UniProtKB/Swiss-Prot annotation:
The keyword Cell cycle is annotated on this UniProt entry: no
Organism listed in the record: Arabidopsis thaliana (Mouse-ear cress)
Record's GO cellular component terms: mRNA cleavage factor complex
Main location: nucleus
GO biological process: mRNA 3'-end processing
PANTHER family: CLEAVAGE/POLYADENYLATION FACTOR IA SUBUNIT CLP1P, PROTEIN CLP1 HOMOLOG 5
Function summary: Required for endonucleolytic cleavage during polyadenylation-dependent pre-mRNA 3'-end formation.
Superkingdom in the source lineage: Eukaryota
Keyword Nucleotide-binding: yes
UniProt keywords, alphabetically: ATP-binding, mRNA processing, Nucleotide-binding, Nucleus
Name of the featured protein: Protein CLP1 homolog 5
Subunit-structure text: Forms a complex with cleavage and polyadenylation specificity factor (CPSF) subunits PCFS1, FIPS3 and CPSF30.
UniProt xrefs under Pfam families: Clp1, CLP1_N, CLP1_P
Cystine bridges: none
Length: 424
């Protein structure tokens, strides 16, 4: 797989090598000389980094670099046309705001906050990439910003169908991604917010409340601020959700990525009475790869597999069993769990908590492990992780499930959504 395709690529200053990997072929890459970065993560010298299939990324250099590549790519080319200077200028302005908070007097600093940046734009505009850059550059300068991920379709922190936040204390590795150990994760259970708009808004509000409590007790997090990534759902219901998120998280800066003149105009119009809020339009990188709906589905399946096996297949998946009587499975909202009409089902009570009958229909379903003690706490509680049901034995009343952890289930309450995964 590796070896015959080894080649060197020389990058001139302020240029980048854009790479799209094939569905089945990994790639190795290392920096030989100069300095280069991926999503703001500075590459170490002479260290091979293995990128799994399906990844798309760009190796950028400010002053020139030579890299070595081992493997076959689906698409690669060098470009000197990048928006990186503008992106770095944005980072520098955020730094000024952070320093302004820390240099304030103690009394005023307690009521001031660092930048709360929310990134919006159409699908495939580079929102997540910009978020990673801003986070990594902030960490490199000694800050510990919080990343908030509201994109249930292509979640970055953990599996799809989640609304989550994580404190970023170390550089975000371009392969391993975001840390999970301190993440606050709510399970929406769907990849399309339109199916249950009220539940989506409610979970966004719950996450904002939790972060408000965290920031009130942590001056470092408060000064470092947050970077919020959103969906590429920017019209009609999607636009209403953007406005809701901007107000709920009390954003101080809305970044619109791409040539979205109407979106910029509408946001400025609808938010003109909100104090201390700026709307900024940044150009989209021409290196952003367009992804089909089928490819997005493949990515979602890959993200679920990565949760259980690890991005580099370095995790052990444990098969365990539990009695029916030791767990309770619930779903949120009145939507049909199986069948082609599930995405269009509207319930009269979108926040209704329903006990699910344990039977064969749970096989291959991904369930969230809730920290809730009682069913009425499910929506307000974060989740500990996820399991996938491998088998349901009705006669023995036992469930067989797989988990990336060998530990027993930390809670008896499990949440069912629409996500499925076939255990390999």
């Amino acid at each position: 797989m590796f070896g015959p395709q080894i080649r060197r690529v020389k990058l001139e200053k302020q240029s980048e090598l854009r790479i799209e990997l094939q569905p089945t072929s990994p790639l190795r890459l290392r920096l030989l000389d100069g300095k280069a970065e991926i999503f703001g993560y500075e590459l170490p010298h002479e260290v091979w980094i293995t990128f799994p299939p399906l990844m798309t990324f760009a190796v950028f250099t400010w002053y020139g670099a030579t890299i070595e590549i081992d493997g076959i790519t689906g698409n690669e080319y060098i470009s000197c046309e990048t928006p990186m200077v503008n992106y770095l200028g944005l980072h520098n302005s955020l730094q000024v705001q952070r320093h302004r908070v820390t240099s304030s007097t103690r009394d005023s600093a307690s009521s001031q906050e660092g930048p709360r940046v929310i990134i919006v734009g159409d699908i495939d505009s580079g929102k997540s990439t910009l978020a990673k850059m801003l986070l990594n550059w902030a960490v490199k300068d000694g800050w510990k910003p919080t990343f908030v991920d509201l994109n249930v379709g292509q979640s970055s922190i953990t599996i799809p169908g989640t609304i989550a936040a994580a404190p970023i204390k170390m550089l975000v590795d371009p392969v391993e991604g975001f840390p999970l150990d301190k993440a606050l994760i709510h399970y929406f259970g769907l990849t399309n917010p339109s199916v249950n708009l009220r539940l989506y808004r409610t979970l966004v509000e719950e996450l904002a409340r939790e972060l408000k409590e965290e920031f009130s007790a942590n001056a470092e997090s408060r000064a470092s601020g947050m970077v919020i990534d959103t969906m590429g759902f920017i019209v009609r219901e999607g636009y209403a959700l953007l406005l809701h998120a901007i107000r709920t998280f009390n954003a101080s800066l809305v970044i619109v990525v791409g040539q979205e003149e109407k979106l910029v105009y509408d946001l400025k119009k609808n938010l003109k009475f909100k104090k201390n809020l700026q709307v900024l339009n940044l150009e989209k990188s021409e290196g952003v790869f367009s992804r089909s709906s089928d490819f997005r589905k493949t990515l979602r399946n890959s993200n679920i597999q990565n949760y259980f096996y690890g991005v580099t297949n370095d995790l052990t998946v444990y098969t365990k069993t539990v009695k029916f009587s030791d767990v309770q499975v619930y779903r949120i909202g009145d939507f049909r769990v199986s069948g082609s009409t599930s995405a269009h089902q509207r319930g009269n009570d979108p926040l209704k908590i329903t006990l699910v009958t344990i039977d064969e229909h749970l096989v291959n379903k991904v369930l969230a492990i809730s920290y809730a003690i009682k069913p009425d706490q499910i929506i307000s509680s974060i989740v500990a992780g996820f399991v996938c049901i491998k088998n349901v034995d009705i006669s023995e009343e036992r469930i067989t499930y797989v988990s990336p952890s060998a530990a027993e289930l930390p809670s008896k309450i499990l949440i069912l959504g629409t996500l499925t995964w076939h255990v390999t």
